[in-house]
Swiss-Prot record:
A GO CC term assigned to this protein in UniProt: cytoplasm
Purpose of the protein: Required for biogenesis/assembly of DMSO reductase, but not for the interaction of the DmsA signal peptide with the Tat system. May be part of a chaperone cascade complex that facilitates a folding-maturation pathway for the substrate protein.
GO BP annotation list: chaperone-mediated protein folding; protein maturation
Protein name (record): Probable Tat proofreading chaperone DmsD
Pfam families linked to this entry: Nitrate_red_del
Family classification: Belongs to the TorD/DmsD family. DmsD subfamily.
GO MF: signal sequence binding
Organism: Haemophilus influenzae (strain ATCC 51907 / DSM 11121 / KW20 / Rd)
Domain of life: Bacteria
HAMAP family attached to this UniProt entry: DmsD_chaperone (MF_00940)
Key word Chaperone present: yes
Keyword list, A-Z: Chaperone
InterPro entries: DmsD-type, DmsD_chaperone, DMSO/NO3_reduct_chaperone, TorD-like_sf, TorD/DmsD_chaperones
């Protein structure tokens, strides 16, 4: 259990930061350096089949030779319509809006347990990057809340979003990041014995 919590702490912060911050943000310097190591995957304590391992490493290597700032802008900022919006309520709300009912439920959870954090521009808290970093925070400080958070507020939609992101062409680095995150979340789910409820997606 302790090893799982440690993994969630490390990988949650690392993956969350890469999804949340722009590539030129100083907070990503060391993380991108990590991914530039030829054998970085040997340090990732998650089991991968050979095909997935090769695909992720090839996409990471190729992606880091591209302009990932442009890719980040296209995927997560705009100004055009985002192909895969990074907020959970977009997929769970019948009207496909941010600040939907699933976000309100997440906010109730945060308020009930007196968890507060500041976002960059008062954006919804159910951003994929923030949710990963919140998982890391809970693993470090409130592990008794972690399973409930993952089961009811995060894993319900995370796989759906990540699978869509993994299919976006010309975004090699973020395609790889999506595949890596899927495998990592699946391992957390197994380790913590989480049964994720089936939900309906509207996008």
């Amino acid at each position: 259990m302790q090893n799982t919590l440690q993994q969630i702490s490390i990988y949650g912060r690392l993956l969350g930061a890469v999804f949340y911050y722009e590539p030129n943000d100083a907070r990503l310097t060391d993380i991108l350096t990590f991914f530039r190591q030829p054998n970085w995957m040997q340090e990732w304590e998650i089991s991968f089949d050979v095909k997935t391992h090769k695909k992720i490493t090839a996409l990471i290597e190729k992606g880091l030779q591209q302009n990932i700032t442009e890719q980040y802008q296209y995927l997560f900022i705009g100004p055009n319509e985002l192909p895969t919006p990074p907020w959970g309520s977009v997929y769970l709300d019948p009207e496909c809006v941010i600040f939907g009912n699933s976000l309100l439920a997440l906010r109730d959870f945060l308020q009930q347990h007196q968890i507060a954090f500041q976002t960059q521009q008062d954006e919804p808290e159910d951003h994929i990057g923030l949710m990963l970093m919140l998982a890391a925070y809970l693993a470090e400080n409130r592990p008794h809340l972690l399973t409930k958070f993952l089961r009811e507020h995060f894993l319900t939609w995370a796989y759906h979003f990540l699978e869509q992101l993994s299919k976006i062409e010309n975004s090699d680095f973020y395609q790889a990041l999506a595949l890596l995150t899927i495998k990592t979340l699946q391992q957390w789910q197994v380790d913590l014995h989480i049964n994720v409820p089936t939900v309906r997606f509207y996008r």
